[in-house]
Amino acid sequence: MNSIKATKGLLALSQQDDLMDLTSNYPLSASEDEGDSDGERKHQKLLEAIGSLSGKNRWKLPERSEAGLKVSEFNVSSEGSGEKLALSDLLGPLKPSSSLAAVKKQLSRVKSKKTLELPLHKREVEQIHREVAFSKTSQTLSKWDSVVQKNREAEQLVFPLEKEPSSFAPMEHVFREWKARTPLEQEVFNLLHKNKQPVTDPLLTPVEKASLKAMSLEEAKIRRAELQRARALQSYYEARARRMKKIKSKKYHKIVKKGKAKKALKDFEQLRKVDPDAALEELEKMEKARMMERMSLKHQNSGKWAKSKAIMAKYDLEARQAMQEQLAKNKELTQKLQVVSESEEEGGADEEEALVPDIVNEVQKTADGPNPWMLRSCSRDAKENEIQADSEQLPESAAHEFPENEENDKPVAEEDELLKELEKRRSLRKRSELNQAAEPLGNQETKDSTSQEVLSELRALSKKLSKENHLSKKQKKSPAKAVDLVWEEEPAPEEDEPLLLQRPERMRTLEELEELGKEDSLPNKERPRPSVEGEQVRRNPQNHSKGKNKKEQMISLQNLLTTRTPSVTSLALPTTVEELEDEGARDQKQMIKEAFAGDDVIKEFLKEKREAIQANKPKAVDLTLPGWGEWGGMNLKPSARKRRRFLIKAPEGPPRKDKNLPNVIISEKRNIHAAAHQVRVLPYPFTHHQQFERTIQNPIGSTWNTQRAFQKLTAPKVVTKPGHIIKPITAEDVDCRSSPRSDVPVMQSNPKQHSKHQKQRKKSSIG
């Protein structure tokens, strides 16, 4: 069967070959070309059928080819087998023949015809155009990046940015082209030219120009140094005058005025010695000015100007000073000139020195440190003692001049007795000081205390003497008045209190003053103390026993800081120091109660807090409407049941911040005015919120900063000069350089978009 099939196939193949020969010998048409393609397909099927005749696949034996000298048509070399066959290679042998011109035209027509690509979508085309336009505009705008960055980082911008060159042209160049136009200007210039006057005001005169040309470099340097020195001295004198003008001390101005008067007198004396005639003329001028001032009263603040200044003197400091200067000038002019000799000046100086007593100098030497309060009190006591001493040492001539002092013989005897008592007390105190040597007090403090004791005793004695003399005179004149009251300070007992705890003065009658001598004669006897002191002893007996041994001390910083505030029970009784803490707290509470007795501050505060809490609470919504489901009208209220039904309770809000703070009210309302000044976005120069907060926390007011720093902090960001035209900036004004972003091409800046376009083009071409 297989052989029969094979023979049939061979017969069919042979017939097909014959047909192929016929077709090759005759020209082919278009229909014949289609049939030829079908024959090739059939021939291919025949070969496949022949290959499948044997069920077994034959082994292909390897063939070996060797190079030989003879080349036959059956042995073709395989050179260039890897290269592709081009259409030009096939058309090469057909060129000389003209019969194949039509075939050549057909082939060239087929070669020239190509498939056209599909056009892009309209949106894609517009996107590409936008990218190209963006690249061009970004390249042009990037030239201004440096300028914009510089203007943003600048602390202050001053427009116009172009600064006009400041050139100082001399007046000759300015008026060179100017001409007189009006008839008045022409007449003025004609007069100037006729008289050969300079029309302009040159900086340097011809003489100065000649001197500059004649001056050498060294002379110019010396001249400049002299001018600099003169300017410096002038500035020093001006600063000194300003400082002296600001001094408000009356004593200083009095001394300056005295010095000026003395200097004027000395100059006048010198002028009188040198030129008597000129001195007489000067004296006549001064006397004439004094007379004119006394007649006219020009500087007595009685004119229109002075009255207008007097109205504003209460508010204006300059007006007040002007009025004072007027009065001072009036006093100076109306004062008669008195020439004081040198002997009188020396005598006046001696008198001033004699006014200072010796005891004041002694106290100043013994005083520890510059304590002006103690020195002032010492000087006051010393002056009183000095007056008493002067009254004792009056000469006989003074006694004759004052016959009224003849009655003072009796008080002098009493004074001697008091001085003796003073000596006794001083000796007793010295002994007590020797016994109390173990106390932690320095030698200097003891000296100060003794000096203070002496001064206080002298003061008390002098007061006693003067008041007793005064009372004795009054008793002689009016003996019926026996209850006159005088101010008198209690004499210091043995247990001297500190200066801070001294008792105030109180009134004493004449009977008490008569018994004063008896009490002074018994220094060791204890006097009855007030009732408050007894209560203090009962409360704290230990402190009272210690206080007996203490003596009068100066002000000490440690004692002042450690002592508590005393509780004053009565103004006429001595103050007591409460050492118990509960007593001090009770007194403080009592004082606060007395201060706020009429005002119930706590209740008002609690009421205000309750109102604030109620105002901030979420309120319920009442949806009841009158007339719905029941009668409505005037004076008809909806029932409570209906209200409860239509009442929507609001949810409770978060707890208040001041819930556990009874003494504080914290407002939780949002302040709209403050919210307008809050910043939601971080400003440009700052990179972190802490930097911005730190700058906001710093104060910029003039209270906390210097004037220069305040002006710098509050300087405006942009300043425009008035009257100047602000023109737009151009590329010629600024050296603009393009930034690196413009160098990147458009397609490179977005490669994904570019690849997307390429894929779409390929798909369209394949389709």
UniProtKB/Swiss-Prot annotation:
It holds the Pfam family Utp14. Residues 23-49, 338-554, 730-767 are annotated as: Disordered. The modification Citrulline is found at R431, R586. The keyword Iron-sulfur does not apply. Residues 753-767 have a biased composition (Basic residues). Residues 317-346 form a coiled coil. It comes from the Eukaryota. May be required for ribosome biogenesis. This is U3 small nucleolar RNA-associated protein 14 homolog A. It comes from Mus musculus (Mouse). The gene is Utp14a.
